[in-house]
Amino acid sequence: MRLKLLWVGKTQESWVRTGIEEYAGRIRRYAPLEILEAREEKGAQAAAMRERECERLAKLIPKGGRLVLLDERGEAMTSPELASFLSKNRDQGTQDLVFAIGGAYGFTDAFRSQAFKSISLSRMTLTHQMVRVFLLEQIYRGFTIINGEPYHHE
């Protein structure tokens, strides 16, 4: 199973980039990982920005890819539940598991309708920059749980 992370806009803060690089490297010990950035839309009305950004994200999804949205309206999962989700997708032969983080205005309804699943990392509002690191850490944590490694503690 290949993992793809899609997000809108460049990573601004160097410390966020450092976190991304750290956890991406750890994840790659378990599965191929590709991170792709869609260009952020600027200077338009919120609905138009959301539409254009979702169009750009959609072009990055490989054919047959299983899309998982990171969305405040998504399902809350524990780390072991995410581990189980990763394991089931791997075992069922999912070729590309694609996680998408939207821009400041989120996703269009049309883009949401393409998703296999929608998950939320927190009921709190998080910056789109920090969600990148949090998601990568949780995916890494999931793989350590799957492999019975001493990273996650209950």
Curated annotation (Swiss-Prot):
EC class (word): transferase
Q: Name one Pfam family in it.
A: SPOUT_MTase
**The EC number(s) this enzyme carries:** 2.1.1.177
Keyword rRNA-binding assigned to the entry: answer is no
Q: Which InterPro entries match?
A: Alpha/beta_knot_MTases, RlmH-like, tRNA_m1G_MTases_N
Cited SUPFAM superfamilies: alpha/beta knot
The reaction(s) this protein catalyses: pseudouridine(1915) in 23S rRNA + S-adenosyl-L-methionine = N(3)-methylpseudouridine(1915) in 23S rRNA + S-adenosyl-L-homocysteine + H(+)
Q: Which residues form a coiled coil?
A: none
Where along this sequence does the record place binding of S-adenosyl-L-methionine? 70, 102, 121-126
Q: Which GO cellular component terms are attached? A: cytoplasm
An annotated Gene Ontology molecular function: rRNA (pseudouridine-N3-)-methyltransferase activity
Q: Identify the keywords attached in UniProt to this record, alphabetized.
A: Cytoplasm, Methyltransferase, rRNA processing, S-adenosyl-L-methionine, Transferase
Q: Where in the cell is it found?
A: Cytoplasm
Q: How does it assemble?
A: Homodimer.
Q: Which family does it belong to?
A: Belongs to the RNA methyltransferase RlmH family.
The protein's role, per its UniProt record: Specifically methylates the pseudouridine at position 1915 (m3Psi1915) in 23S rRNA.
Q: Which PANTHER family match?
A: METHYLTRANSFERASE, RIBOSOMAL RNA LARGE SUBUNIT METHYLTRANSFERASE H
- Annotated protein name in UniProt: Ribosomal RNA large subunit methyltransferase H
